[in-house]
Amino acid sequence: MIGVSEYTRFFEDHCLQLYILDGGATVKFCIGDDADLETLLVSMETTASNLKMVLAPIDASRIKVQMIDQLFFGVARGIDWNTLSRTIVNRVCGSAGFPIPNEHPKAALTDLAEIYSCDPRELQRDINREFQKVIFKDHNMVQDFRIAMLRLCQYEFRTGQVSDVEAEAINQWLVGELKQVSLLRSARIFRKVDRTNARGMLFSLVRWINKGGYSGLLVTLDLRQFFKPRVVGTDDLPILYSRAAVIDAYESLRQLIDNTDEFKNMATVVCLPPEFLNDRMRGVDAYQALKLRIYDEVRDQSRDNPFGSLVRLGASSDLGSHLARTEKGDDNGC
């Protein structure tokens, strides 16, 4: 087992800084009791803040994690879309030759035209051309996502091309709250986010976060709800998972692992109780395709491998002394 503080330190220094921030992606499964997992989740908040990553905490008791579209919506609800759009707008204006003054960080089209004493229509033409280059022609993002981000940036810059109703509909579409997709026809978006396109939307979201100046996305998936019994007489009932739903969730995680080469700058930390290893009905044995990707059948019983996909949290191991030797230069690292 590896102590929580030791593993968190290792994860930040060796996995995130040396791999994820350099364009990598990974999925880690952390097994521990409630106290250890709560400590891990809190420490991930600090880690994300230290590395300027966007943290997306997903709790299976509140979000149906077996559905990839609901997983995307859960991540999207934690994103400040307006702030990201403003960051891109300011960057685009700068690259177009019209940098936003520090004293006017939220300057709109007419404000910027007045500052630079130019025709607003000509300025809009130049900025729209740059929007096309930075956003719409970036094919690392799927088309619907590119269109949505282009419209949000145009709305943030107040170009007059996007109405309040359309901008609000886009924000609702991103978080799964849009009732009528027909509200987005004028924006050339014709379908909702569902399980068939949500994975591509998640790829695109990570790319957009990077454009907005963040170093990456850190997702924490708290799946302890999979193994909790049904509670009777509770007003605020959490989501209950059947065995089929649990296996569907494992299938989504398996796909996430297989798609790590398509993600960049994204780390997923999956938090699970010890039952994940022991429960044959709901644990890793219930879905062999996932087990084959993460389970360490051949491992050292006396030493923990922090690089492994499956990490057992608990009493401190000798990892702490190893890290200390590494910092002093007495060791070449793990």
Q: Which residues does each PLM region occupy?
A:
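N-terminal pre-Walker A segment at the start of P-loop NTPase domains
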Residues: 1-15
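A short linear-motif detector with a strong N-terminal bias
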Residues: 6-10, 34-37, 197-199, 247-250
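P-loop NTPase nucleotide-binding core
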Residues: 20-212, 334
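The catalytic "switch" region of P-loop NTPases
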Residues: 152-334
